[in-house]
């Protein structure tokens, strides 16, 4: 019979129980034992839920207090030397220190602090993992038995699970080496014995199969990296009497498919949502007789109810070729990336609820597909019929389908993505209109969010205060922020965004086509959870979104005020996106809505408008040969949003990451008049790519690190400005912080900005002398 399996379940709990427990421990409100009890209760609940839903293969060790890659670091003893660890078991405090760093008070005065390990995006998802660190001195030993302990814990509960572990090759490739002459794969020989020991201990505990995640198989790999996979699994296949199930996800294997199919393993998992063609490719290549395929047919990264009839055809294709005993049915990836349970959503209409499937509902779909493939039509027909009705309803829904929006997208032409004149002609007009000096100063948008702001927004949402009371408060905050900036001496001001919480949610709630959940939480990193909006229908803007507050801000000053908007690509990337049309089409709809807002801001006298695109690079496909298509439509959408204005109106954008070399041409094609970037920590190194490319427009490299509470001195910011001027012309450069100031306090922000303005004035005097 076909096997219903799962690769991973959300660990946070349906109501973010894990977040509260871990943060309670960090604050000292919970003891270690109380934290462990809370975690065990969550695990037991998750295993019971999945077993009751009918899964044949339930995962364990998918739970984590913080991150699964950090768990693997603890398992193999990959603890950087700067952390106080005695080389035995990695305890809970060492584990959290690796993720969060140590402050002086944690170290009893022995040191001033220990920096946390780096965190970065998990492939092209919105989850973040802790980056392993490797050096010539790195050694490995079994230093955490969590994977074995949790297998035994589940077994005691009556659930025989399949433990999940990051595979050894991906573990090394996901890390960073601390020496230029060290290749992470040089450590494979030392790492494999620890993995072999884990497999043997699992086998001794009665475990029959282990899931080894090798997501790097969907990336562009070198011959040496493919050889490392062969070496690793040849060794692990002989390590213990246990089945090896290798999971790949987030894309197709493409040229790595032969390597994966030839590994000495028992099951290979294929993502058939982002690599739907690879089942046919695998069957055409030839699947070894002793290899079963796990079919990732249920989308583990989106929230839509599956088309079960269509997916059944895929499952039956595999069964016809391999037989039912060699086919597993599962999600495309771990269900970590979707909310826990649709039944916790009281705010969605009954009709809308039928459109979606969260983790619990996705497991129901997996089980139904496996059972239907085994001929159990009567038992599964209700869910299949629910799937049919949902897809038919979406196709016919007036809420989803807006002919006016579709017609407008169809009418987009090249002229809508071009400014009237090139930047070289626009720039002098803008400098005159805005009365800008050399090296103008500004900020990125947000100012400190106080407890009062958060409280007033919450009270207004709950109807505890009137609209007039709320708006009076917001006006007061804006006026204070404008006055503070004038006192500091900034050249272009912002209104401070006191009315905004999340930068995507704020706009999404004002756009038709977006839906929001109450409990649709997913883990971003550690205890940080987010509720991504759902782009469910055609997107349009029923009325202006920001002109009310920007007009008020503009009336408070004679200094230019910059409008702040979230860009279409970022709105797309940080949402669950509809699956019934291309992402490019949805992005164009958002871009048209933002375009309308840009033009309205211009009409009310805002002459500088910033369209933030922090997620622009995140949208890059994992395979380089797919980049051009994405960059073509992503750049088009930014230009569609920004190109309707007059030459005198200055368009800014902001990107907060430091790798531009491989997309610098696309950034130039966006044709923003000014791009501000995070640069202070890298000491302006990222400007090398702008300099080498001869970037034509204006740049604001950050000179104030807003991620730290310290106040940078005038002298150090002067030095950064002068360093930047080695790569940029004075007429090309702006002076600004790295990012928005929302998370900082006024006592830090005020003196930091005063020093920044003074530094700019000092360098300006010399540059213009």
From Swiss-Prot:
Residues at which 5-methyltetrahydropteroyltri-L-glutamate binds: 16-19, 121, 528-529, 574, 618
Enzyme category, top tier: transferase
GO molecular function, one term: 5-methyltetrahydropteroyltriglutamate-homocysteine S-methyltransferase activity
Cross-referenced InterPro entries: Cbl-indep_Met_Synth_N, Cobalamin-indep_Met_synthase, Met_Synth_C/arc, UROD/MetE-like_sf
Cofactor notes: Binds 1 zinc ion per subunit.
Superkingdom in the source lineage: Bacteria
SUPFAM superfamilies: UROD/MetE-like
EC id: 2.1.1.14
Region listing for Disordered, in residue ranges: 415-450
Catalytic site: 707
Residues at which Zn(2+) binds: 654, 656, 678, 739
Family the entry assigns: Belongs to the vitamin-B12 independent methionine synthase family.
Protein name: 5-methyltetrahydropteroyltriglutamate--homocysteine methyltransferase
Higher taxonomy: Bacteria, Pseudomonadati, Rhodothermota, Rhodothermia, Rhodothermales
Gene that encodes it: metE
